[in-house]
C-alpha cells in the first residue's frame, strides 16, 4: 500500500510528517491523511515525493519493489 511505503521512507530518512509537509507545501494534517490512507494522493504530490526520496512513482505505488 502506498501509505506504508511513504511512512517507511520518511522514517528511514529520520523525518517527521511536518518536515515532509513543509517540503510539499501542505499541512501536516493533510500529509498525515496521505500516510494513513485517509485521502488519495494527487499525482503532483507523488512526483514530488518520488523526486525527494530519489525513487520511482512505481515504487511508491507498489508497482515494483525496486527503488
Regions found by a protein language model. Name each.
Residues 1-4, 36, 40:
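Residues at secondary-structure transition points
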Residues 2, 6, 56-57:
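Hydrophobic side chains within well-formed alpha-helices
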Residues 4-23, 48:
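Short basic helix-loop element that most often maps to the first helix and adjoining turn
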Residues 6, 20-21, 31-34, 60:
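Conserved hydrophobic/aromatic packing and binding residues within compact polymer-binding modules
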Residues 12-13, 33, 61-67:
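Short, charged recognition helix plus adjacent turn
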Residues 25, 44-59:
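DNA major-groove recognition helix of helix-turn-helix/homeodomain DNA-binding modules
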Residues 26-39:
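Recognition helix of helix-turn-helix/homeodomain-like DNA-binding domains
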Amino acid at each position: 500500500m502506498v501509505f506504508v511505503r511513504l511512512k517507511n521512507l520518511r522514517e528511514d530518512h529520520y523525518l517527521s510528517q511536518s518536515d515532509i509537509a513543509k517540503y510539499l507545501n501542505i499541512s501536516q494534517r493533510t500529509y498525515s491523511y496521505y500516510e494513513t490512507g485517509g485521502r488519495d494522493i494527487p499525482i503532483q504530490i507523488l512526483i514530488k515525493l518520488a523526486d525527494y526520496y530519489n525513487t520511482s512513482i512505481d515504487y511508491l505505488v507498489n508497482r515494483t519493489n525496486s527503488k
